[in-house]
């Protein structure tokens, strides 16, 4: 069975033609500030790919608001703010964090009267101490390493319109959850949830994170390219962030570079690649939009799920 049977496929030029605006709302300096370390994104990417996507999301959001209003009227209930939730999924190092941050900024520029918030699910990993207690430290990043009950409670509280909801944050420099530095979400109109696991279907819960999504995006690339970007990022970090003595990977930056890369390649082989193949990639066709990348993070195709 063709896995793309439920999708319309567009090349870059065709996708751009749906909203051919030359207004980017951003400068290249803005993009450089939000992109991940080795990601590549340009103003042309914004014009060709992201502005049409943002316009589509705006249309979906307006329809969502209208439907919520009609539903509340039909049920004779007082209206309340129910946030529109967008999920961003994809492998490590594929550029999903850049996509999430870019969508947040563009939505703020397009709808300045709306509160646009973003979280990452990294904060819902179990702390290292708990992973060690459970004997799954080597499985960090796999589905069982996430506190799904806590994540689902967070999503439910946001969806219920709680005045403020807190989410744990994660520090890549210390390689652990930062329980004492929570992120507070204040009744967003739109919430972007970014993470490798947001479209997964865990076997131990009846409710899934994706059940809360009104729209979802999967950032896609061939595994060989993702590995290349992963190792490129690791090399850049060896020369920058890893030079900080407080960084988790500081010993690798001070030791033999070949040994450091040997370790990184082993982590990719033992953790990230199996996680991609077994748990992340199978969720791709659950997304509403798939952004397909080629060399240099160039998006050459966009897949849009048919209604």
UniProtKB/Swiss-Prot annotation:
Known pathway: Cofactor biosynthesis; coenzyme A biosynthesis; CoA from (R)-pantothenate: step 1/5
Catalysis performed (reactions): (R)-pantothenate + ATP = (R)-4'-phosphopantothenate + ADP + H(+)
Keyword field: ATP-binding, Coenzyme A biosynthesis, Cytoplasm, Kinase, Nucleotide-binding, Transferase
Record-linked Pfam families: PRK
Main localization (coarse): cytoplasm
EC code: 2.7.1.33
Residues annotated for ATP binding in this entry: 90-97
Gene Ontology MF terms in the entry: ATP binding; pantothenate kinase activity
An individual GO BP term: coenzyme A biosynthetic process
InterPro entries: P-loop_NTPase (IPR027417), PanK (IPR004566), PRK/URK (IPR006083)
Top EC category: transferase
Compartment(s) of residence: Cytoplasm
An annotated GO cellular component: cytoplasm
Family of the protein in this entry: Belongs to the prokaryotic pantothenate kinase family.
Protein name, UniProt field: Pantothenate kinase
Annotated source species: Limosilactobacillus fermentum (strain NBRC 3956 / LMG 18251)
């Amino acid at each position: 069975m063709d896995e793309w049977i439920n999708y319309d496929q567009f090349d870059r030029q065709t996708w751009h033609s749906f909203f051919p605006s030359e207004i980017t709302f951003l400068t290249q300096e803005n993009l450089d500030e939000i992109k991940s370390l080795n990601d590549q994104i340009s103003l042309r990417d914004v014009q060709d790919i992201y502005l049409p996507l943002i316009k589509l999301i705006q249309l979906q959001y307006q329809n969502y608001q209208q439907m919520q209003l009609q539903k509340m009227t039909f049920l004779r209930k007082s209206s309340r703010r129910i946030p529109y939730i967008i999920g961003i999924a994809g492998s490590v190092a594929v550029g999903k964090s850049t996509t999430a941050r870019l969508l947040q900024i563009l939505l703020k520029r397009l709808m300045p009267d709306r509160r646009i918030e973003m979280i990452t699910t990294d904060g819902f990993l179990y702390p290292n101490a708990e992973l060690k207690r459970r004997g799954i430290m080597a499985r960090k990043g796999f589905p069982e390493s996430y506190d799904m009950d806590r994540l689902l409670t967070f999503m439910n509280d946001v969806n219920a319109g709680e005045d403020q909801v807190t989410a744990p944050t994660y520090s890549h420099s210390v390689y652990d959850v930062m329980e004492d530095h929570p992120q507070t979400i204040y009744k967003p109109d739109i919430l972007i949830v970014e993470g490798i696991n947001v479209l997964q279907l865990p076997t131990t819960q009846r409710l899934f994170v994706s059940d809360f999504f009104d729209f979802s995006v999967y950032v896609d690339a061939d595994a060989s390219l993702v590995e290349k970007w992963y190792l490129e990022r690791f090399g850049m970090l060896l020369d920058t962030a890893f030079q900080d003595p407080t960084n988790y990977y500081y010993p690798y930056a001070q030791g033999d570079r070949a040994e450091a890369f040997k370790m990184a390649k082993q982590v990719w082989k033992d953790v990230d690649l199996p996680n991609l193949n077994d748990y992340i990639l199978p969720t791709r066709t659950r997304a509403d939009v798939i952004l397909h990348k080629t060399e240099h993070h160039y998006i050459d195709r966009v897949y849009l799920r048919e209604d």
